[in-house]
């Protein structure tokens, strides 16, 4: 039995089939009062209850008089509970569709406004990381619609989906009110609380589904906007042919500064060394230590040895000029020493690609110790070819690397042109190598006086002797470690009882002659 009270409504029982006859409103029934008759399963008697006009008073229910037949047609038998539920579901569905359309229009307007305010991402950003520049919160920040939502036919029409057809309670989830135009077109129907209570279990799920659908729509609009921006950037011609072009003035400035800063470091590897031997007056000890530590670059240099018996060669001067006042000329013809400083960093000289950039005191003598392995060991150095040396041949006495004016003449070393990243290398004669090896077996470290005397006897510079001893000690260490590794592997393979002693490193002077 369905009991309807003026203050509240409780559902105590429903018939299995909602086929109760409907009572049309008569002329003696006051407007706003509704009489509902239902059959009871216990007594079988019909009981009617008159409701006051305060419970179901709305703009539509007050028009149920015989003089207003349009109200009856719009509500389609309002006295039936099934008709009430159906009408309520249709009304909530229309409100939900309008709400979704408003959200979509607001999101599209916010996305267009955000794209107009913020410029597209820089070219240095990767394509996969462009999603981090936008977010749903930024898209939903401005919720003011630009155009009135008057397109009611664009909403989702799938009535089988629970998210679209489930009614939403106006008490638990309050959607934003529609604009005035939409409110004027759709009448605001107020339904009986029984219809709302009948579907209370679906309210929370419908609200969650609607929120998820709105978020999905926002993400789809965002992805479409980003795809359009990516297509526009892909169709535009690139500003430069570099892998990471700079599209902003700040990026261009940073790129130019990086190029200028990296140019001396790149070209310093293949700078030719003429007779500029007093470089210690210009370059500090830090550059010398950096070149000594860079042993990987020491093995890519070749230097020619000039005639050691020519005693009448002109003396070198600190500015890189010989006695006749002529500067050393490379095969490409660099300018004289007076104009060298201004020509080094000029754009034309840098564009040519073959102007020497700042020769270092260590570049010509960096790999002096590894040269004898190709000559005395019987293994030729790969990539070497005979080319005529350039520059005035002869010996140069006087102030060299760390020497004074009282030292005897030394060997003049000139660069042979190979490839841009190749550094000069000093090939020693067989007699010099034998003397160096003999001295190394006697003493691995030379004092300053011993090094000066020994270099004078071999007609080498002190720097050449010093670097040769450094590389020879490194080679002896590598050979010693390789020999120890062989002993360890042999002991472990045999499983000898003394294998634990083979694991400990040891040093024996007899290993120094290997090589």
Swiss-Prot record:
<keyword id="KW-0238">DNA-binding</keyword>
<comment type="function">
    <text>Plays a key role in the specification of proneural and promuscular cluster formation. Required for the specification of dorsal and lateral muscle progenitor cells. Regulates development of peripheral nervous system derived from lateral neuroblasts.</text>
</comment>
<dbReference type="GO" id="GO:0035309">
    <property type="term" value="P:wing and notum subfield formation"/>
</dbReference>
<feature type="region of interest" description="Disordered">
    <location>
        <begin position="214"/>
        <end position="279"/>
    </location>
</feature>
<dbReference type="GO" id="GO:0009953">
    <property type="term" value="P:dorsal/ventral pattern formation"/>
</dbReference>
<dbReference type="InterPro" id="IPR020479">
    <property type="entry name" value="HD_metazoa"/>
</dbReference>
<feature type="region of interest" description="Disordered">
    <location>
        <begin position="307"/>
        <end position="342"/>
    </location>
</feature>
<feature type="compositionally biased region" description="Polar residues">
    <location>
        <begin position="254"/>
        <end position="265"/>
    </location>
</feature>
<feature type="region of interest" description="Disordered">
    <location>
        <begin position="1"/>
        <end position="76"/>
    </location>
</feature>
<dbReference type="GO" id="GO:0005634">
    <property type="term" value="C:nucleus"/>
</dbReference>
<dbReference type="GO" id="GO:0035222">
    <property type="term" value="P:wing disc pattern formation"/>
</dbReference>
<dbReference type="GO" id="GO:0007398">
    <property type="term" value="P:ectoderm development"/>
</dbReference>
<dbReference type="GO" id="GO:0043565">
    <property type="term" value="F:sequence-specific DNA binding"/>
</dbReference>
<dbReference type="InterPro" id="IPR001356">
    <property type="entry name" value="HD"/>
</dbReference>
<protein>
    <recommendedName>
        <fullName>Muscle segmentation homeobox</fullName>
    </recommendedName>
</protein>
<dbReference type="GO" id="GO:0007485">
    <property type="term" value="P:imaginal disc-derived male genitalia development"/>
</dbReference>
<dbReference type="InterPro" id="IPR017970">
    <property type="entry name" value="Homeobox_CS"/>
</dbReference>
<dbReference type="InterPro" id="IPR009057">
    <property type="entry name" value="Homeodomain-like_sf"/>
</dbReference>
<dbReference type="GO" id="GO:0000977">
    <property type="term" value="F:RNA polymerase II transcription regulatory region sequence-specific DNA binding"/>
</dbReference>
<dbReference type="GO" id="GO:0007389">
    <property type="term" value="P:pattern specification process"/>
</dbReference>
<dbReference type="GO" id="GO:0007476">
    <property type="term" value="P:imaginal disc-derived wing morphogenesis"/>
</dbReference>
<keyword id="KW-0371">Homeobox</keyword>
<feature type="region of interest" description="Disordered">
    <location>
        <begin position="142"/>
        <end position="185"/>
    </location>
</feature>
<dbReference type="Pfam" id="PF00046">
    <property type="entry name" value="Homeodomain"/>
</dbReference>
<feature type="DNA-binding region" description="Homeobox">
    <location>
        <begin position="421"/>
        <end position="480"/>
    </location>
</feature>
<dbReference type="GO" id="GO:0000981">
    <property type="term" value="F:DNA-binding transcription factor activity, RNA polymerase II-specific"/>
</dbReference>
<dbReference type="GO" id="GO:0048598">
    <property type="term" value="P:embryonic morphogenesis"/>
</dbReference>
<dbReference type="GO" id="GO:0007450">
    <property type="term" value="P:dorsal/ventral pattern formation, imaginal disc"/>
</dbReference>
<dbReference type="GO" id="GO:0007417">
    <property type="term" value="P:central nervous system development"/>
</dbReference>
<dbReference type="InterPro" id="IPR050674">
    <property type="entry name" value="Msh_Homeobox_Regulators"/>
</dbReference>
<comment type="similarity">
    <text>Belongs to the Msh homeobox family.</text>
</comment>
<feature type="compositionally biased region" description="Low complexity">
    <location>
        <begin position="214"/>
        <end position="249"/>
    </location>
</feature>
<feature type="compositionally biased region" description="Low complexity">
    <location>
        <begin position="17"/>
        <end position="65"/>
    </location>
</feature>
<dbReference type="GO" id="GO:0021782">
    <property type="term" value="P:glial cell development"/>
</dbReference>
<dbReference type="GO" id="GO:0007420">
    <property type="term" value="P:brain development"/>
</dbReference>
<dbReference type="GO" id="GO:0007517">
    <property type="term" value="P:muscle organ development"/>
</dbReference>
<feature type="compositionally biased region" description="Polar residues">
    <location>
        <begin position="7"/>
        <end position="16"/>
    </location>
</feature>
<feature type="region of interest" description="Disordered">
    <location>
        <begin position="90"/>
        <end position="113"/>
    </location>
</feature>
<dbReference type="GO" id="GO:0007400">
    <property type="term" value="P:neuroblast fate determination"/>
</dbReference>
<dbReference type="GO" id="GO:0042659">
    <property type="term" value="P:regulation of cell fate specification"/>
</dbReference>
<dbReference type="GO" id="GO:0007419">
    <property type="term" value="P:ventral cord development"/>
</dbReference>
<keyword id="KW-0217">Developmental protein</keyword>
């Amino acid at each position: 039995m369905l009991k309807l009270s003026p203050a509240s409504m409780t559902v105590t029982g429903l018939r299995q089939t909602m086929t109760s006859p409907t009572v049309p409103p008569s002329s003696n029934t006051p407007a706003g009062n509704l009489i509902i008759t239902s059959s009871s399963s216990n007594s079988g008697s019909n009981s009617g209850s008159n409701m006051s006009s305060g419970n179901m008073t709305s703009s539509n229910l007050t028009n149920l008089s015989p003089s207003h037949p349009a109200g009856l047609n719009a509500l389609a038998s309002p006295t039936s509970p099934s008709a009430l539920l159906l009408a309520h579901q249709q009304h909530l569905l229309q409100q939900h569709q309008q709400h979704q359309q408003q959200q979509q229009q607001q999101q599209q307007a916010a996305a267009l406004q955000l794209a107009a305010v913020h410029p597209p991402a820089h070219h240095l950003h990767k394509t996969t990381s462009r999603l981090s520049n936008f977010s749903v919160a930024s898209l939903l920040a401005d919720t003011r619609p630009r155009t009135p939502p008057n397109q009611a036919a664009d909403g989702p029409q799938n009535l089988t989906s629970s998210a679209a057809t489930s009614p939403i309670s106006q008490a638990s989830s309050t959607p934003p009110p529609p604009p005035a135009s939409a409110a004027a077109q759709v009448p605001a129907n107020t339904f009986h609380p029984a219809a709302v209570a009948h579907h209370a279990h679906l309210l929370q799920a419908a609200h969650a589904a609607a929120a998820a659908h709105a978020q999905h729509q926002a993400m789809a609009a965002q992805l479409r906007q980003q795809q359009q921006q990516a297509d526009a950037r892909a169709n535009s011609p690139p500003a430069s042919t570099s892998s990471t072009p700079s599209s902003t003035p700040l990026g261009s400035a940073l790129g130019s500064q990086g190029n200028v800063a990296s140019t001396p470091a790149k070209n310093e590897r293949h700078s030719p060394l003429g007779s500029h031997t007093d470089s210690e007056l210009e370059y500090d000890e830090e550059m010398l230590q950096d070149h000594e530590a860079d042993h990987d670059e020491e093995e890519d240099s070749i230097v020619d040895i000039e005639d050691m018996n020519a005693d009448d060669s002109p003396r070198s001067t600190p500015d890189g000029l010989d006695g006749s006042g002529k500067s050393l000329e490379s095969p490409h013809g660099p300018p004289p020493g007076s104009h060298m400083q201004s020509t080094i960093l000029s754009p034309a000289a840098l564009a040519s690609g073959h102007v020497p950039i700042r020769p270092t005191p260590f570049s010509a003598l960096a790999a002096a110790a590894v040269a004898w392995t190709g000559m005395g060991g019987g293994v030729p150095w790969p990539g070497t070819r005979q080319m005529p040396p350039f520059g005035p041949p002869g010996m140069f006495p006087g102030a060299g690397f760390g020497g004074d004016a009282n030292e005897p003449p030394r060997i003049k070393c000139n660069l042979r042109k190979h490839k841009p990243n190749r550094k000069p290398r000093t090939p020693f004669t067989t007699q010099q190598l034998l003397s160096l090896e003999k001295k190394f077996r006697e003493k691995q470290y030379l004092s300053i006086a011993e090094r000066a005397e020994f270099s004078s006897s071999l007609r080498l510079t002190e720097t050449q002797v010093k670097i040769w001893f450094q590389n020879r000690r490194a080679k002896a260490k590598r050979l010693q470690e390789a020999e120890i590794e062989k002993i360890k592997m042999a002991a472990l393979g045999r499983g000898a009882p003394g294998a634990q002693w083979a694991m400990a490193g040891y040093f024996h002077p007899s290993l120094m002659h290997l090589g």
